[in-house]
C-alpha cells in the first residue's frame, strides 16, 4: 500500500548524513520524511566518541554556518573541548570535542522531533520506486510505499554490511544492528558503479578495570572553546580528562604472532580500509621501526563506564584483543565490554554524482556519507546537508547549489569525490585545500551564512546574530583605523612599553595591531584604544583580518584568476572524440569522468594544461563558452 500523504523529500538513514539532510530539507520548507530502521539510534556515534579535528572541525563550522545541527549538538554533549594547532596560524587551527554519546544522541533526536515539516518513521527500506529513470519513492520491509520528488540515500555502512572478528564473520550494519541486504541488491541492479570498503573500531574497555593513576592525563582547554557560532561555553556539560598509554614491544609481538588470524592479512576482507585511521595491525606492520604507538583512553560519557581506546582499532580474534589490551601500562587487568571489529560495506563511485550529490543517471536520487566512500561523522554531516538542500531545491523545481573549492571545505570534499573518486575511505585534511588562508574555521559564517540565508537554511535568529557580528567588526575596524598615536603624544610611552621598537611616526590602531608582538587583547588595554569588543567572535575577526590583510588579499587575487576558467561549463553530452588535438588518453578519461566544468577536468589525473587549453579554444569556436553563476 501507499502511505496516504506524499512527501517532497525522503531521507533513508538516520546517521550523521541523514539527520543533517532531513533538517536541511525541512528547514527549507519542504515536507520531509526520515526513514530509519531504529528511531532510538538517530545520531548514533558508531565509532569514536568525538567531533572535529584537523579539517573535520572546519566542516562542522561550515555545516553550522549553513544552519546545520552538528555543532549545536556537540556543544550540548561535549565533555572535553580543545583547539588543535593552537600555536599555529588561524588557517590550520581546529576545534575538537570528546562527546558523551548519550547526550549527543539526545540532542540530535530532540532537534529532529522539534523541526517543523519533518516526519520520522521507523522501518527499514528495501526498495526504491523508479519510473522512467527517475526515483520517486521508497518501499519499506513491510511493503509500505512512500512517494516523493527526491530521495536521499544516507545508509552508512549498512549496505550488505559484513562484520569481521578474527576469521569469523556475520552480516551486520554495525555491532547490534542488522545490515541492509535487499536495498544493496536493488541498488546493484541500477546503472551505478559499486565497490567495497572497510572500516574498523577498537574494543571498548571497562573504566573500573583500568589503573588511571599510572597514566598521563590530558585536559581540555580553559577557557572552553565552542563549536557553534550560536553557542557559548555555558551549554557544555561537565568536563572530564582523557588519559594516555602506549603500545610496547610486547603488544607488537602479540600482533605479529597472530597475523595469520587477522581477516585482513588472511585475505578474508576484500574492502580497502582508511589510510589515516589504520588498524593497530596495520600500524605495527607499516611502521616496523617504531617500538610504541600512543593510545588515547577516551571516556564515552559521563554516566558510562566504557572507555574508547583511540588507536587500537582491530579485527583480530577476541583472545588476541585481550592480550593486546592487557599488554599496555595501566591496562594489565582491563576487561573488554565490547570487542573490536572490522566492517565491510558497499559504496558507490562518487564520480557518478553531480556536484549537488544527485546521481547523473537517476534523476531525484541523491547520495551522502559513507555510501560515497568517505569516512567520518563530519564528512558525512557536510554531505548530508548539501544533499538535503539540493533534494529540497529539486523538489521545488529550483536549480541545485554546490560550493566552490575556494569557498568551503565542503566544496573541496565534493569536488574531490565527484572529480577524482576514491579507492579508500576519504578523510578531510586542511592540506587538501588550495586556499587554506581563506577557508578558516573562524570565518565559516562570513563565507557561508549569507548564502545559507538565500537558500532558506538560516533562520531569523542566526541571521540577526550574524549581521550584528558584521556590524561589530566593521565598526571596530573603523575605530582602530581612525584612532591614532604620534611619537610625541602623552600616550606614546604607554604604547611603546608594549612594542619591540618604539614609535617613529604616527600610527593607527590597525598599524599597531599588524606588529607581530601586538595582539588585539593587548592593544585594547592601552588607553587610546580601549575598550575591547565584548563580542569575542568579532574581536577575533578584527585581529585576523588586520594581521593577515596582505596575505588574504593576495590569495583572493589568486582565486579570482583561477575562477575565470574554473567555472567554464562542459556539456554533459559532449563526446570528447569530437575535440581534435586531444590525446587518446585524455579523451578516454574525459569521456569516463564527464566533468561538469573546466575546473573539474583540470583535476583529473592525466588531463594536462595543454589539453585544457585545447578544450577552451574548441568551446570558443563552437560558441559554447559558458560560465556558471
Curated annotation (Swiss-Prot):
GO cellular component: cytosol
Binding-site residues, NAD(+): 273-287
Cofactor(s) the protein requires to work: FAD
SUPFAM superfamilies the UniProt entry points to: FAD/NAD(P)-binding domain (SSF51905)
Binding site for FAD: 13-18, 125, 180, 370
GO molecular function: flavin adenine dinucleotide binding
GO term, biological process aspect, one: tRNA wobble uridine modification
Keyword set includes Flavoprotein: yes
Transmembrane residue ranges: none
Coiled coil, from the record: none
Subcellular location: Cytoplasm
Protein keywords: Cytoplasm, FAD, Flavoprotein, NAD, tRNA processing
Pfam hit, one: GIDA
InterPro entries assigned: FAD/NAD-bd_sf, GIDA_C_N, MnmG, MnmG-rel, MnmG-rel_CS, MnmG_C, MnmG_C_subdom, MnmG_C_subdom_sf
Highest taxon of source: Bacteria
Family of the protein in this entry: Belongs to the MnmG family.
Subunit structure: Homodimer. Heterotetramer of two MnmE and two MnmG subunits.
Function as written in the Swiss-Prot or TrEMBL entry: NAD-binding protein involved in the addition of a carboxymethylaminomethyl (cmnm) group at the wobble position (U34) of certain tRNAs, forming tRNA-cmnm(5)s(2)U34.
Entry protein name: tRNA uridine 5-carboxymethylaminomethyl modification enzyme MnmG
Gene encoding the protein: mnmG
Amino acid at each position: 500500500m501507499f502511505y496516504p500523504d506524499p512527501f517532497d523529500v525522503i531521507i533513508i538513514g538516520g546517521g550523521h548524513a541523514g539527520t543533517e539532510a532531513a533538517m536541511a530539507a525541512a528547514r527549507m520548507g519542504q515536507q520531509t520524511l526520515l526513514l530509519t530502521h531504529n528511531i532510538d539510534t538517530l545520531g548514533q556515534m558508531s565509532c569514536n566518541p568525538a567531533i572535529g579535528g584537523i579539517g573535520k572541525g572546519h566542516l562542522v563550522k561550515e555545516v553550522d554556518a549553513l544552519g546545520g545541527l552538528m555543532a549545536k549538538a556537540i556543544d550540548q554533549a561535549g565533555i572535553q573541548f580543545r583547539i588543535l594547532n593552537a600555536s599555529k596560524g588561524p588557517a590550520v587551527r581546529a576545534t575538537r570535542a570528546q562527546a558523551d554519546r548519550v547526550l549527543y544522541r539526545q540532542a540530535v533526536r530532540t532537534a529532529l522531533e522539534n523541526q517543523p515539516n519533518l516526519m520520522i518513521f521507523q522501518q527499514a527500506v528495501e526498495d526504491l520506486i523508479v519510473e522512467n529513470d527517475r526515483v520517486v519513492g521508497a518501499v519499506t520491509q513491510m511493503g509500505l510505499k512512500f512517494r516523493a520528488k527526491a530521495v536521499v540515500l544516507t545508509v552508512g555502512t549498512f549496505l550488505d554490511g559484513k562484520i569481521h572478528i578474527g576469521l569469523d564473520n556475520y552480516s551486520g550494519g554495525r555491532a547490534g544492528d542488522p545490515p541492509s541486504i535487499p536495498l544493496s541488491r536493488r541498488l546493484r541492479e541500477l546503472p551505478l558503479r559499486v565497490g567495497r570498503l572497510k572500516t574498523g573500531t577498537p574494543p571498548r574497555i571497562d573504566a573500573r578495570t583500568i589503573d588511571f593513576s599510572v597514566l598521563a592525563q590530558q585536559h581540555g582547554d580553559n577557557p572552553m572553546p565552542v563549536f557553534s557560532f550560536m553557542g557559548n561555553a555555558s551549554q557544555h556539560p561537565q568536563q572530564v580528562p582523557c588519559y594516555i598509554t602506549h603500545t610496547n614491544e610486547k603488544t607488537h609481538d602479540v600482533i605479529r604472532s597472530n597475523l595469520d588470524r587477522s581477516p585482513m592479512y588472511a585475505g578474508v576482507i576484500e574492502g580497502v580500509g582508511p589510510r589515516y585511521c589504520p588498524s593497530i595491525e596495520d600500524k605495527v606492520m607499516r611502521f616496523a621501526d617504531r617500538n610504541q604507538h600512543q593510545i588515547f583512553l577516551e571516556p564515552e560519557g559521563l554516566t558510562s563506564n566504557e572507555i574508547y581506546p583511540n588507536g587500537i582499532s582491530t579485527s583480530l580474534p577476541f583472545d588476541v584483543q585481550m592480550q593486546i589490551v592487557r599488554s599496555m601500562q595501566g591496562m594489565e587487568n582491563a576487561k573488554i565490554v565490547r570487542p573490536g571489529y572490522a566492517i565491510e560495506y558497499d559504496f558507490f563511485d562518487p564520480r557518478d554524482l553531480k556536484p549537488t550529490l544527485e546521481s547523473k543517471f537517476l534523476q531525484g536520487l541523491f547520495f551522502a556519507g559513507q555510501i560515497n566512500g568517505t569516512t567520518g561523522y563530519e564528512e558525512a554531516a557536510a554531505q548530508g546537508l548539501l544533499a538535503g538542500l539540493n533534494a529540497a531545491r529539486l523538489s521545488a523545481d529550483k536549480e541545485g547549489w554546490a560550493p566552490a573549492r575556494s569557498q568551503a571545505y565542503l566544496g573541496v570534499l565534493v569536488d574531490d569525490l565527484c572529480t577524482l573518486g576514491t579507492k579508500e575511505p576519504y578523510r578531510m585534511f586542511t592540506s587538501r585545500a588550495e586556499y587554506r588562508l581563506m577557508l578558516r574555521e573562524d570565518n565559516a559564517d562570513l563565507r557561508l551564512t549569507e548564502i545559507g540565508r538565500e537558500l532558506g537554511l538560516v533562520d531569523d535568529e542566526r541571521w540577526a546574530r550574524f549581521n550584528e557580528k558584521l556590524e561589530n567588526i566593521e565598526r571596530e575596524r573603523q575605530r582602530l583605523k581612525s584612532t591614532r598615536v604620534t611619537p610625541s603624544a602623552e600616550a606614546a610611552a604607554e604604547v611603546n612599553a608594549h612594542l619591540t621598537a618604539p614609535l617613529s611616526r604616527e600610527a593607527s590602531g590597525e598599524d599597531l595591531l599588524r606588529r607581530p608582538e601586538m595582539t588585539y587583547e593587548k592593544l585594547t588595554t592601552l588607553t587610546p584604544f580601549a575598550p575591547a569588543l565584548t563580542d569575542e567572535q568579532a574581536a577575533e575577526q578584527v585581529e585576523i583580518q588586520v594581521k593577515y590583510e596582505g596575505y588574504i588579499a593576495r590569495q583572493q587575487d589568486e582565486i579570482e584568476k583561477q575562477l575565470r576558467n574554473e567555472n567554464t561549463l562542459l556539456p554533459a553530452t559532449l563526446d570528447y572524440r569530437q575535440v581534435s588535438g586531444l590525446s587518446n588518453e585524455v579523451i578516454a578519461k574525459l569521456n569516463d569522468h564527464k566533468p561538469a566544468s573546466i575546473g573539474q577536468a583540470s583535476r583529473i589525473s592525466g588531463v594536462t594544461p595543454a589539453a585544457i587549453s585545447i578544450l577552451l579554444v574548441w568551446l570558443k569556436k563552437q560558441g559554447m563558452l559558458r560560465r556558471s553563476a
